[in-house]
């Protein structure tokens, strides 16, 4: 059931035309503010509803928008759907943080998701998709991969797991079979890819590893906002090629 059919929405006060065709979506709205103020020229705040800040400006003369997604599949599901369906956005790149899920992954590695696994029923309820794996846009991933070659960033490409629970009790349970393929754990990409598939749009996901349960390492909240510059730059350089 759809409760709303146009812009602005109950969650986004931006007017039609306020967003660029390509939007970068960190989870944290304060990270969106930091990126806009640090990297964009003529950045204008186009949404403040519920504190989910969104900005549109120029990067190297090209229009780019940045908006927080909030945490988790439902939040990303709402905001990315509205951007695609009501604001004419064509491309969304999630730029987030993640936990390492493989011994080969190190802190601060940047991972480009080629697919997202989840046990969530989001896609089934939203559009009837019954699988547990959704792909990123191959077109966007190709642009991001090619763009990374002109940087000193080591980009790791592979699967991520998009979970629905952050805090969970320790129980004896068998991991999902797909976990042996997964390089990082995050909480939003499955909803983004589901919306892109349902609406005929494009979605990609870049994450920087900021937590490692095996070693106990983790970044502080301030570091998560300011220490992810290589990923931010890669996303912006890729965005202007889309």
PLM feature spans:
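Metabolite-binding pocket within alpha/beta catalytic cores that recognizes anionic/polar moieties
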Residues: 1-133, 138-143
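Glycine-rich beta-alpha junction loops
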Residues: 29, 99, 161-166, 191, ...
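Flexible, glycine/charged-enriched surface loops at secondary-structure junctions
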Residues: 41-48, 152-159, 242
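Active-site rim beta-loop-alpha module in soluble metabolic enzymes
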Residues: 130-179
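Generic non-transmembrane alpha-helical segments
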Residues: 143-151, 195, 234-242
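Short pre-catalytic strand/loop immediately N-terminal to key active-site residues, enriched for Gly-Thr
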Residues: 181-184
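Zn-dependent metallopeptidase/amidohydrolase metal-coordination segment
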Residues: 190-223
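His/Asp/Glu-rich mid-to-C-terminal helical/loop segments that flank catalytic regions of hydrolases
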Residues: 213-242
């Amino acid at each position: 059931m759809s409760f709303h059919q146009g812009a602005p929405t109950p969650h986004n006060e931006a007017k039609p035309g306020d967003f660029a065709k390509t939007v970068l979506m960190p989870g944290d709205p304060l990270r969106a503010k930091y990126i806009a103020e640090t990297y964009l020229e003529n950045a204008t705040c186009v949404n403040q509803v519920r504190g989910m800040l969104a900005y549109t400006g120029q990067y190297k003369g090209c229009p780019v928008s940045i908006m927080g997604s909030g945490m988790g599949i439902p939040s990303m599901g709402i905001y990315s759907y509205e951007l695609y369906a009501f604001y004419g956005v064509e491309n969304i790149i999630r730029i987030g943080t993640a936990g390492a899920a493989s011994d080969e992954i190190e802190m601060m590695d940047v991972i480009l998701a080629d697919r997202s696994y989840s046990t969530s029923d989001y896609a089934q309820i939203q559009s009837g998709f019954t699988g547990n794996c959704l792909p990123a846009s191959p077109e966007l991933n190709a642009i991001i991969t090619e763009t990374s070659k002109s940087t000193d960033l080591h980009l790791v490409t592979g699967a991520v797991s998009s979970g629905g629970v952050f805090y969970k009790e320790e129980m004896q349970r068998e991991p999902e079979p797909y976990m042996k393929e997964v390089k990082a754990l995050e909480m939003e990409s499955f909803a983004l890819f589901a919306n892109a598939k349902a609406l005929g749009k494009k979605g990609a996901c870049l994450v920087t590893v900021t937590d490692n349960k095996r070693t106990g390492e983790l970044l502080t909240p301030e570091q998560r906002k300011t220490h992810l510059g290589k990923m931010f730059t890669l996303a912006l350089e890729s965005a202007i090629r889309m």
